[in-house]
Design a protein with these regions (language model features):
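Extracellular/periplasmic, surface-exposed regions of secreted and cell-surface proteins
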Residues: 1-164
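Conserved small/polar residues in nucleotide/adenosyl-binding loops
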Residues: 169-174
């Protein structure tokens, strides 16, 4: 009865977190006395990173829809793939407490996810006023962190690795 094929590709950007991460952030408060006069204090909360850019995503989707027997049976199936790069992440580095502020985020991570969506429908008219319908769906998706900051402590310990599928961790061979 019906056959429809779909194909899409797109690229998008996302600036995760604050819109002003390229600028330093300052705080005010904690008055101190100088010569008996209370003075307001100011400090740097976070050092800006002027080199950050948008996180980038490339997305691909292929789908098919079809129905037979006047729409009694129909199927919809989709395969999707997404690759994210330049993900904003906090560096995995230790800085001395004397530094006083955390390190700003940098574009360092990448991940991809892929999967399928399936939907099967059954519709049957019984007489003039009755209809039976049933629908089943199935989805499978896999997310894998391809690149993040990895230290020797996490890289050499399979239970603490930061790369690999999100549900469990392993190191991917490239």
């Amino acid at each position: 009865d019906k056959l429809k094929l779909r194909l899409s590709y797109g690229e998008s950007g996302n600036l995760a977190g604050s819109s002003y991460q390229y600028m330093s952030d300052y705080g005010f408060g904690n008055a101190v006395n100088f010569g008996g006069v209370p003075m307001m204090g100011m400090w740097e909360n976070l050092q800006g990173n002027p080199n950050i850019t948008w996180e980038k995503a490339k997305k691909f989707d292929f789908g098919v829809e079809f129905s037979v027997l006047n729409g009694m049976f129909s199927l919809e199936a989709d395969y999707f793939y997404e690759k994210r790069s330049n993900m904003l992440m906090a560096p995995n580095a230790l800085v001395p407490a004397e530094y006083g502020i955390p390190l700003s985020q940098v574009n360092a991570g990448s991940m991809h996810n892929q999967g399928i969506d399936l939907s099967l429908n059954f519709n049957k008219r019984i007489g003039k006023d009755w209809m039976i319908s049933a629908k089943g769906t199935f989805t499978f998706a896999r997310n894998i962190l391809d690149e993040v900051f990895e230290t020797e402590a996490t890289f050499n310990n399979p239970n603490r690795r930061r790369t690999g599928p999100v549900s469990y961790t392993h190191l991917r061979a490239h």
